[in-house]
Regions:
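Short, well-ordered secondary-structure micro-motifs
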Residues: 16, 43-47, 90-94, 120-121, ...
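Glycine-rich, Arg-bearing micro-motifs that act as flexible, cationic patches
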Residues: 107-128, 146-147
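Intrinsically disordered or low-complexity boundary/linker segments at protein termini
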Residues: 1-14, 132-162
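Structural beta-alpha unit
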Residues: 71-108, 135, 144-147
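Acidic, proline/glycine-rich short linear motifs
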Residues: 37-61, 148-162
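Short, structured coil segments at secondary-structure junctions
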Residues: 27, 125, 132-134
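Short, solvent-exposed amphipathic alpha-helices that sit
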Residues: 19, 57-70, 95
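Small/aliphatic-rich secondary-structure junction motif
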Residues: 2-47, 162
Length: 162
């Protein structure tokens, strides 16, 4: 079982990676974190805080920086990055979907505060990734989930046939 986490270093991407790590530990699953780095848009990398204002833009440097962020949250996760010719959300989501086709995840963990909206903005990377029916999608909206009562492992479930 593999979990895929599109990762851009944002608060909600951190939350999605942390959540995937929790589920992976419980289910003995592998995690693949993927970052899409636009080659044409140095400003995008600066906006994501992948590159300092006085630092030269270099895809390898950005990939190394983001990989360290991933390892800090999910040391067991595999990391891969993809280059994109543009920073458009559509292109980034296309790259993520391509990786999903290669990795064949059971679940994609998306950190997004708008992926679950009934009307998904065209500019939403998460919305474009979430529409694929080849995998389940776990949308993470908060770093810590609300309190969930412990589930008894008695094996008795509502509606269970005996």
């Amino acid at each position: 079982m593999t979990f895929l986490v599109p990762y851009d270093g944002s608060y909600l991407a951190d939350a999605a990676l942390a959540r995937a790590t929790e589920y992976a530990a419980a289910l003995d699953a592998d995690i693949v974190a993927v970052t899409v780095i636009p080659e044409d848009d140095e400003g995008y990398s600066r906006d994501k805080n992948w590159v300092e204002a006085d630092e030269a833009f270099d895809v390898q440097t950005v990939a190394s920086f983001v990989h360290k962020q991933v390892v800090n949250i999910a040391p067991e996760a595999s990391f891969r990055y993809e280059r994109s010719p543009t920073s458009s959300p559509e292109r980034i989501s296309t790259e993520i979907q391509r990786v999903a086709d290669e990795e064949v995840p059971s679940v994609v963990f998306l950190g997004s505060d708008n992926a679950g909206q009934i009307v998904t903005p065209v500019t939403s990377v998460a919305g474009n990734v979430a529409k694929d029916a080849e995998y389940d999608v776990h949308i993470v909206r908060y770093f810590s989930p609300t309190e969930i009562q412990e589930i008894e492992s008695s094996g008795d479930y509502p509606g269970e046939m005996r």
